[in-house]
Amino acid sequence: MSSSNEQICLDEDWIQKFGDREIEFVDEAQKSEVDETEKSIKRFPLSVLQRKGLALINLRIGVVKTGFGGKTIIDFEKDPAFSNGEELPANSFSPGDVVSIRQDFQSSKKKRPNETDISVEGVVTRVHERHISVALKSEEDIPSSVTRLSVVKLVNRVTYERMRHTMLEFKRSIPEYRNSLFYTLIGRKKADVSIDQKLIGDIKYFNKELNASQKKAVKFSIAVKELSLIHGPPGTGKTHTLVEIIQQLVLRNKRILVCGASNLAVDNIVDRLSSSGIPMVRLGHPARLLPSILDHSLDVLSRTGDNGDVIRGISEDIDVCLSKITKTKNGRERREIYKNIRELRKDYRKYEAKTVANIVSASKVVFCTLHGAGSRQLKGQRFDAVIIDEASQALEPQCWIPLLGMNKVILAGDHMQLSPNVQSKRPYISMFERLVKSQGDLVKCFLNIQYRMHELISKFPSDTFYDSKLVPAEEVKKRLLMDLENVEETELTDSPIYFYDTLGNYQEDDRSEDMQNFYQDSKSNHWEAQIVSYHISGLLEAGLEAKDIAVVTPYNAQVALIRQLLKEKGIEVEMGSVDKVQGREKEAIIFSLVRSNDVREVGFLAEKRRLNVAITRPKRHLCVIGDSNTVKWASEFFHQWVDFLEENAIVMDIDATMFE
């Protein structure tokens, strides 16, 4: 066998093993999520699932209408006969969630003999304070309007199936896929870093405020042949850089597919480009998009473009039929209505498909999530490059959805922050981090100026995670809370870092029985929660607005406890677990560490990148609340962090009598 044939065999073996490994991971992650979800659904009654935010009970059908793609959308609202008030209780539902719609017998005295169980699947399209909208797979799934219903969150198997399908395609020997970029991305060769100087010889920047590192990233990404990695630490203007790259590529007559790991990441780029005049379209359900970018959504463009009047007219006819379905129990009448709806839907989809194809084909830039890149609207579309934002937060199979067959990719992210949030026993390395390690500085551009944090707040993350290369911009390095309008100068507002040290009093897990039931695998610390409340009260008294404050903690149980204490004081601020605040920023961040024990166990905080996310959210003020005796001795890394706090923060030693 010749050496070239041997190499082909080696490459093919590598590809198959690579694909099998990712498919195995997808299967493991899906099984873990399904098992956990089914365990909760079986273990707890619907009333408890509602209190956990995983279900909504005692609902009735409100409005029935037609949505994008001719889908039947039902608004479910609270049934006043069984509920107090009109607003839905607090919940964790969001657009895109897969749900089960079930007949609610649980709070009834008993199930009637002629009643049958209803279990219909749908996808959440909108969550309003008074109703939740769900798109059904079929109009024949519409339950009776007289039925009391519940909506329960399920695992979204479609996302896993799309990843699995993509990796199966990855393994197929299709010449179109096996290009130079493909072998670079799987680690079989170094990236081709040849530069087309003609593309950047006379470059003029749209954004005149770009710094030197941003300009370097723009020029490299435009001119490099196949791969660019933009490493953007917190507050370094990664989105501004990507916007400039897109504008420059379009100016050079390139067609771009822009993807992100989240809807918000994609929408932020669309928002910045909305006034550029570039022909562009945002794929995805409008309920998942920022209101400011809806005019660029495929849904709005299809209803206002060619055939828009026809599409709206058919949609109105379908809505009339849908309203009749919920008002009749007669089987013959319902079958006749369903027949009419099916005919109307055929016409709807015919006109819509033609309109959508024209809109997408005419767009120089197409935006979607990574999963959205596998939608039918993009089938057969060709692009000169793909840009993936938040690439460090995406699973490898997600990234391959838009990448198969592409010749050039620009990945942006920060592998020093949290990696993809998946339920797996194995540590997961994103494509972005893998390529940073394997391809090195040849293809990496580091954004080194941050525009968010006071210099003291950014010092530890810069020294620890970014080789001391992350520097604050002049306009942010000295700013404090007291510099804000209407904020008084106090010890709190004059300090960039505050540290309440609970000094080994071991108050961890001071939870009620209810809290233990709802957050079995979570932790809380009542004492720290009281300190959070105390500190926030001090900031508010100094004139800081509640909207400028956020509470961050590693545990959902602590979030619930703090929210409860603040509610008693009439205080409402944004709060969340560390995993949910990545990408966010506030003037002041209060960080409750929770763990306080004599075995020096720090739990979630053992992941260094989780700490990096938490302490890089604030602009002017970081307040840390925790037990130095537990945290400091957990590892050398945490020893260094506590030493930094003790040397640079205002330290308040707290004893157990402070809040008695």
Swiss-Prot record:
Using the UniProt record, name the top-level EC class of this enzyme in a single word: hydrolase
Q: Can you supply one Gene Ontology CC term for this chain's record?
A: nuclear replication fork
Q: Which UniProt keywords apply?
A: ATP-binding, Cytoplasm, Helicase, Hydrolase, Nucleotide-binding, Nucleus
Q: What is its main location?
A: cytoplasm
Record keywords: Hydrolase included?
yes
Q: Where in the cell is it found?
A: Cytoplasm; Nucleus
Gene3D superfamilies in UniProt: 2.40.30.270, P-loop containing nucleotide triphosphate hydrolases (3.40.50.300)
Q: Where is the signal peptide?
A: none
GO terms under biological process:
mitotic DNA replication lagging strand elongation
Spell out the SMART domains in the cross-references. Answer: AAA (SM00382)
Reactions catalysed: ATP + H2O = ADP + phosphate + H(+)
Entry EC number(s): 3.6.4.12
Q: Extract the InterPro entries matched here.
A: AAA+_ATPase (IPR003593), Coronavir_polyprotein_1ab (IPR050534), DNA2/NAM7-like_C (IPR041679), DNA2/NAM7_AAA_11 (IPR041677), P-loop_NTPase (IPR027417), SF1_C_Upf1 (IPR047187), SMUBP-2_HCS1_1B (IPR048761)
Q: Where does ATP bind?
A: G232, P233, P234, G235, T236, G237, K238, T239
Q: Name one GO molecular function term.
A: RNA binding
A Pfam match is AAA_12
Assigned protein family: Belongs to the DNA2/NAM7 helicase family.
Its annotated function is as follows: DNA polymerase alpha-associated DNA helicase which may be involved in DNA replication.
Listed under subunit, the entry gives: Associates with the hexameric DNA polymerase alpha.
Official protein name in the record: DNA polymerase alpha-associated DNA helicase A
Q: Supply the source organism for this entry.
A: Schizosaccharomyces pombe (strain 972 / ATCC 24843) (Fission yeast)
**Encoding gene per record:** hcs1
